[in-house]
Amino acid sequence: LKSRNQGLKISKFMAYLLPVEGKSPVFGENVFLADNATLVGDVVCGDECSFWFNAVVRGDVHYIRLGNRVNVQDGAVLHCTYQKHPLHIGNNVSIGHRALVHGCTIHDNVLIGMGAIVMDGAVVESNSIIAAGAVVLEGTHVEAGSIYAGVPAKKVKNITPELVAGEIERIAKNYVFYSSWFKQKETGGK
């Protein structure tokens, strides 16, 4: 781990962190790594991020950049395309259980639903939701303030400010809170 990771609290059953081509994952402050999360290569994340059980983040073939308060939920996979598509994720983003996010750009305040797929070159603008099970095809541009659903994903409606606060922001904040339960366990309840 790089020097920026000093003081990173992980359990005795440490997450799998692997350097690739001389690059190792780098973490901001107050980050949670589940015991069996896997992060490899050129991955840089901001503060208050969480990587949950069986999450896989592979910055091996290209780089991955995550902002603050990104939660990568159980079984989700983040990856890139060799020499073509890195992965950029903004702030306050929730990647739902078993979602696949591949070589795309996700702006701030976004919820990627459970089992959704977002493919290479797609751009998901801020304050948007990708519904559970949706497939955002390669190169798709998801409009800001919208909900996309289906296979292939299409816009189904505009999002309300209440839904942004009630779902997107709430879930991002909740995952910071949930991670505190595990950090207390790791430090003996302190």
Model-derived features with residue positions:
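Short, basic, low-complexity termini and linkers enriched in Ser/Thr/Gly/Pro
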Residues: 1-12
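Glycine-rich hexapeptide-repeat left-handed beta-helix
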Residues: 11-26, 60-68, 74-77, 81, ...
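N-terminal segments that cap or nucleate solenoid repeat domains
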Residues: 15-51
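Short proline/glycine- and basic residue-enriched helix-capping loop/turn segments at helix->loop/beta transitions
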Residues: 94
